[in-house]
Curated annotation (Swiss-Prot):
Protein origin, superkingdom: Eukaryota
Family annotation (PANTHER family): FAD-DEPENDENT MONOOXYGENASE APTC, MONOOXYGENASE, FAD-BINDING
Top-level EC class: oxidoreductase
UniProt-recorded name of the protein: FAD-dependent monooxygenase nscC
InterPro entries: FAD-bd, FAD/NAD-bd_sf
MF GO annotations: FAD binding; monooxygenase activity
Similarity comment: Belongs to the paxM FAD-dependent monooxygenase family.
Lineage: Eukaryota, Fungi, Dikarya, Ascomycota, Pezizomycotina
Pathway: Secondary metabolite biosynthesis
Amino acid sequence: MAKPQATVLIIGAGISGLTTSRLLTNSGIPNIVFEASTPDRSQGFAISLQEFGYSALLSALGDLPLSSLIRGVAPDREIGGTGWIDQALRDNCTGELLVAPDLTTAKQTVVRANRNALRRWIADCGEEELDVRYGHKLQSVEGTVGDITAVFENKARYRGSLVVAADGVNSTIRSQVLPGVVPETIPLIHYHGEFQLSRTAFDELIRPHSGHSNILVGVGDGFNTPLSICNMTKTQVHLDWSYSRTVTGDDDLLYRPNLPSEEAKQIPPALVKELAALALAEPWKRFLNPESLKSHRVFHWTTRCVYMTQDDARRAGEQGVVFVGDSWHAMPIFGGEGGNHALLDGVELADAVVKVVASPGKDHLSKAVASYYAGAWKRSQEAVRRSTQRFFLLHRPAAEWKEIAEKKKKAV
């Protein structure tokens, strides 16, 4: 098979960037991944992988079995778990089960995955090691498709055939080649906390409520408080919680969308006061309270979405840039599908590149980019809208949740 004349340059070692790199590498197409952070960076929280996302990845990797993915990424993999979630919604002020999906089917369709473990698993799914270069923060790109150069803040310069923008919601590449495409800040409050428990404490305090589910979703009167397993061993459990709600008005003390990174790690007094007034049920009240917060790592997350028109994507392609992941379809984390579409982006882009490189003729990469966007643009942009709508629906008033629960009971 003929190879492209120059290397594909992938900016960002997240899910979409590593998926693209792994599949190109497995097909013999040279590529380099550049990552601004250090190798020890951590994003150890868990995400939900849906069948449409992981099945495409497993197929592209040579029809690997689902069990291989589960053994590598499930938060409870070290104790023989499968990353299973019950997909139930509970009233976080009473503990009452509001929405309970039919669990009579034996097939598991959603898999919780630890993000760190997922990145490692993707990177390891091949005989040849990926070329990932850390400490490379992008400064600019220059050139056109087939001949483009990436310039980094450490003065390094790399020439390639195509730049894959896998650099996230605040994409440096997007801000340069498409300065008019800016992330849209969603009027939502979202705080994320991380903490640890011994297995004994977990089995005593959380397991009676969650069963074997890797996430315990609590919904309240316009706010949510999910508890999620990030990683579990025989002796220790790493967990996180989220507190999210819509903005109440212009004077909302917790709506701070443009916080500096250091301030985003501080616990504001308004959050402590608000959590104390929620009157939560067990197990949520044990962890989302002023005293417990003192021992948790707490982060303020700003929810941003990115929309991109087909014309925008095409113009970037003419400059040698193609987008994957959050750089062009960022969506809410809770209730979102971002990780799944990041996987699909990597699968579909790599497939498009492999097909055109193997075919005769010129303008290989221009054709690959056009082919990729022909399917990926509509899929991903619809997902952004769908996920944003779902986020607001998941933060509905308590009266609506109770109405839904009553209708479910009558339908049985």
